[in-house]
Structures are given as C-alpha cells and as structure tokens.
From Swiss-Prot:
Family of this protein: Belongs to the arginine deiminase family.
Localization: Cytoplasm
Record flagged with keyword rRNA processing: no
InterPro entries according to UniProt: Arg_deiminase
E.C. code: 3.5.3.6
Superkingdom field: Bacteria
Pathway named in the protein's UniProt entry: Amino-acid degradation; L-arginine degradation via ADI pathway; carbamoyl phosphate from L-arginine: step 1/2
MF GO annotations: arginine deiminase activity
Keywords annotated in UniProt: Arginine metabolism, Cytoplasm, Hydrolase
Organism listed in the record: Listeria innocua serovar 6a (strain ATCC BAA-680 / CLIP 11262)
Gene of this entry: arcA
GO cellular component, one term: cytoplasm
Protein's name according to its UniProt entry: Arginine deiminase
Length: 408
C-alpha cells in the first residue's frame, strides 16, 4: 500500500473513502433536463445534504477516514503546473468550441481553485457570463439552452468514475454523456494531489478507453478475483480489456468474472442488484436470476494464447468456488415477495456498503431487506435516505473506497 491505495476485497475493514457532498449542481436540475441528467425527480438539496452528512458521520463513527472529492480536487488544482490544460480538457468535453471555449476558459480562470472546481461541478449558466456578440450559427441556434457547462448532479455517486483494484485504479470511461467529465476530477487528484502524486499508481484502465466501464459494476471478491457486471453501463469488451490489463500487470489477480445482468435503468450496475456483506454472504435481487437460480457468468483467465473464457450458468456455485468455500448465502433483497423485492431494489435495498466483514451501511427505507440482513447475522447501520435515494443510488454508490484492511 505504498502508493496510498489498497483494495483487496469488498468487505475488509474500510479505512479511507472518497465522497462528494451534494451541492449546487443539484439545484441546476430542471424538469426539462431531468432525463438527460439521469434523474427521475428534483431532490430537495437542504435535506439531501443533511442525509449525506448523517451518512458521513456514520462512517466516521466507525473510524473511517472520509475524504471529499471537491476538497481534494481544489487542492490538486493548486499543485497542477498548468490549470489551463485541465480547464481546456473539461471545456472541450462539454462540447464548447472556438470562441465560446476561450470565453468560458478566461472566465473560469478568474476564480481561485475552490470556486473554479465548484463551478465546474455545479455547471456554468450562460446568464453568469456577460453578454457577448455571437458570431457562429451554432451559437445562435443554441441560444435557448441555459448552460455553457452542464451541471454534474450524479457526482455524489463517487463509486462510478473510478475504482481501486489492489494498489491500482481504473479511471473510467463513463457510458452516459452526462457523466463523462466526472472521471477528470479523479485523474486530476491522482496526478497532482500530494497525497497520491509522489508515488506511481498503476492505471488498469483509463478514461480514454474505447468502451465504457463503471465502478458500480466492479466488485473485488478477494485479492485474486474481480467480478464485473456487464450491464446497461459497462460493455463486455471493456471487461475483456480490463482482464488483459490485470493479467499482464497485476500478478495477484488470477481471474475476472463477468456477470451478465439485464440492461435496464433499474439494474444499471451490478451493485444495484448484488453486493457482498460477509465472507460468504451476499445480498441479491432475485429478479436477475431465472427460476432455477441461474445467471450467465463468464470466467476469464490467463492462458498461453491470451484469454481463456469459460461460460457458466451456476452463478452461486461459481462464487463459492472462487471464494474457496463449500457454499455461499444469497440474501434476497426485499425477501420472496415480488412486489416488496422490486420496490426495495428500486430504492437501493441491495446496494449495501460493507465497512467490515458482516457489517454494512444501508438506507433506512428498505426495512424488509434490512431485517433479513440482521436475521442472517449482519450488523446493519441504517442511514436516512428520502432525498439521497432520488438519484437512484445507495450507500455503496456514494463511496469510492481508497483503502481497506486485508482479510486474513
């Protein structure tokens, strides 16, 4: 863990985690742009912040170090030798070109680092910048659109833009255009923040990759096995490229499992339907399996000729095999009632955050799932969630673990 990163499981004692406190980016959501910004409703920011603060305190009460993305990004920007390069990349990926790009960049350069990061995250409205004469057709035709830079309201889901695997990281190419710029902040922090920049950090998969990969689909089962969901947001080709990278550069990784889940918004990532809660216990949304309990899973392993891929259907058996245990316990999200199960999964009942073996943080609203976890011997910390859940993500979604203790 010389470079400050260490994740060898989903359940090792959580030591350091990265979060983003919901901010003014949420107040730049309007009904007209809900769909493009990936929201179903407009959250109430003041309550959302109270809920997030409660969540953070719950972690801190368990002696977890909580780092804030916005703070680290501003500190990293202070260390960066050329702020204009970072801004240019951010503006280009916001589809601003020609004079507009220069105009926006010059405006943002007038702020200190904290305010600049805040504006990049919250979005830059056209009304914030003094009026100028428009020279180009595209500018004139786009006059009604309110933003130079779109807000990033999904940024409080720090799980997805990047994921630590071992002592390296994937800096992810996000599937949805509304989220593409998010991983630029992670890239900035790892390159320029003093906490990370002094050591070499392997990048297993970079944001320039051709196929999307998101952290909600990346689960670290143990130091030898990574489980990746092939989902609405992660492409099978990205999983294959990640496996090739890990096998060539991360000697402890022996296999990558690819689990195929339905490509729907409600199951957008693997961690919305399946999370690890203890050594051989998982919570699962029953609807991702067929009536026989089967799910397509592919075992990717290194071979003399490149990759060897073995298709399987017995998902539960495969998980037990790679963990080296006789069997595993799958705890159904919402229980056996299909109505309760669907409702609680929609509100992230399966999206648990393990902070130690057999100890998790969950949303309080999913009382059936929480009761089932407790009956299975899991210690459950419930956090308030009426507004946080509107973004369609739970406690695991809202965290990027930086370090965990290794399992014995």
């Amino acid at each position: 863990m010389e470079n400050g990163l260490n994740i060898t499981s989903e359940i090792g004692k959580l030591q350091t985690v990265l979060v983003k406190r919901p901010g003014s980016e949420l107040e730049n959501i309007t009904p007209e742009y809900l769909e493009s910004l990936l929201f179903d409703d407009i959250p109430y920011l003041k309550m959302m912040q109270k809920e997030h603060d409660f969540f953070v305190k719950t972690m801190q009460d368990s002696n977890i170090e909580v780092l804030y993305l916005e703070k680290l990004a501003a500190e990293a920007l202070k260390e960066a030798s050329n702020k204009e390069n970072f801004l240019t990349k951010m503006i280009k990926e916001s589809n601003q070109m020609d004079e507009s790009a220069l105009y926006v960049r010059d405006y943002l350069m007038s702020f200190d680092e904290e305010e600049m990061i805040k504006k990049l995250m919250s979005g830059l409205k056209k009304s914030e910048i003094p009026e100028r004469k428009k020279k180009h057709l595209n500018e004139m035709m786009d006059e009604q659109y309110p933003f130079f830079l779109d807000p990033l309201p999904n940024l409080y889901f720090t799980r997805d833009p990047a994921a630590v695997i071992g002592s390296g990281v994937t800096i992810n190419k996000m599937f949805q255009p509304a989220r593409r710029r998010e991983s630029l902040f992670i890239e900035l922090i790892l390159k320029h923040h003093p906490r990370f920049s002094s050591q070499e950090i392997p990048i297993w998969s970079g944001r320039e990759e051709p196929f999307p990969l998101e952290g909600g689909d990346e689960l670290i089962l143990n130091e030898e096995t990574v489980l990746v969901g092939v989902s609405e947001r992660t492409d099978a080709r990205a999983v294959e490229r990640l496996a090739e990278s890990l096998f060539s550069r991360a000697p402890k990784i022996k296999r990558v499992l690819a689990a195929e889940i339905p490509e729907t918004r409600s199951f957008m990532h693997l961690d919305t339907v399946f999370t690890m809660v203890n050594f051989a216990q998982f919570t699962i949304h029953p609807a991702i399996q067929n009536q026989q309990g089967e799910l397509n899973v592919y075992i990717l392993e290194k071979s003399e000729n490149g990759l060897e891929i073995t298709p399987r259907r017995d998902f539960k058996r495969v998980i037990a095999e790679v963990l080296g245990v006789p069997e595993v316990d799958f705890i159904p999200c919402g229980g056996e009632d299909v109505i309760v199960s669907a409702r609680e999964q929609w509100n992230d009942g399966a999206n648990t955050l393990a902070i130690a073996p057999g100890e998790v943080i969950t949303y309080d609203r999913n009382h059936v799932s929480n009761d089932l976890l407790r009956k299975a011997g899991i210690k459950v910390h419930e956090v308030i969630s009426s507004e946080l859940s509107r973004g369609r993500g739970g406690p695991r979604c809202m965290t990027m673990p930086i370090t965990r203790g290794n399992l014995k």
